């Protein structure tokens, strides 16, 4: 077996402190929902630019090179 060090004991106590526990209530659901909505908006904008249904002045989409 290896030696026990103070740093190893500290890191082990920090790393295993929340293992198997569930945060009561909503937890991180609102944050993840907000990030999901931002991702959805980003993907819709990219799709509209690709389909040229979102017209931007001074920005031409030419896929032929």
UniProtKB/Swiss-Prot annotation:
SUPFAM superfamilies: Photosystem II 10 kDa phosphoprotein PsbH (SSF161025)
Membrane topology type: Single-pass membrane protein
Annotated localization: Cellular thylakoid membrane
Keyword hit for Thylakoid: yes
Annotated Pfam families: PsbH (PF00737)
Membrane-crossing segments per the record: 27-47
Primary site of residence: membrane
Organism superkingdom: Bacteria
GO biological process: photosynthesis; protein stabilization
GO molecular function: phosphate ion binding
Keywords noted in UniProt: Membrane, Photosynthesis, Photosystem II, Thylakoid, Transmembrane, Transmembrane helix
Record-linked InterPro entries: PSII_PsbH, PSII_PsbH_sf
GO cellular component annotations of the record: photosystem II; plasma membrane-derived thylakoid membrane
Signal peptide location: none
Function: One of the components of the core complex of photosystem II (PSII), required for its stability and/or assembly. PSII is a light-driven water:plastoquinone oxidoreductase that uses light energy to abstract electrons from H(2)O, generating O(2) and a proton gradient subsequently used for ATP formation. It consists of a core antenna complex that captures photons, and an electron transfer chain that converts photonic excitation into a charge separation.
HAMAP family for the chain: PSII_PsbH
Family indicated by similarity: Belongs to the PsbH family.
UniProt-listed NCBIfam families: PRK02624.1
Quaternary data: PSII is composed of 1 copy each of membrane proteins PsbA, PsbB, PsbC, PsbD, PsbE, PsbF, PsbH, PsbI, PsbJ, PsbK, PsbL, PsbM, PsbT, PsbX, PsbY, Psb30/Ycf12, peripheral proteins PsbO, CyanoQ (PsbQ), PsbU, PsbV and a large number of cofactors. It forms dimeric complexes.
Name under which the protein is recorded: Photosystem II reaction center protein H
Protein source organism: Prochlorococcus marinus (strain NATL2A)
């Amino acid at each position: 077996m290896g030696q026990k060090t103070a740093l190893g004991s500290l890191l082990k106590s920090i790393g295993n402190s929340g293992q198997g526990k569930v945060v009561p209530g909503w937890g991180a659901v609102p944050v993840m929902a907000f990030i999901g909505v931002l991702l959805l908006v980003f993907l819709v904008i990219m799709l509209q630019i690709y389909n040229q249904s979102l017209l931007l002045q001074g920005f031409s989409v030419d896929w032929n090179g």
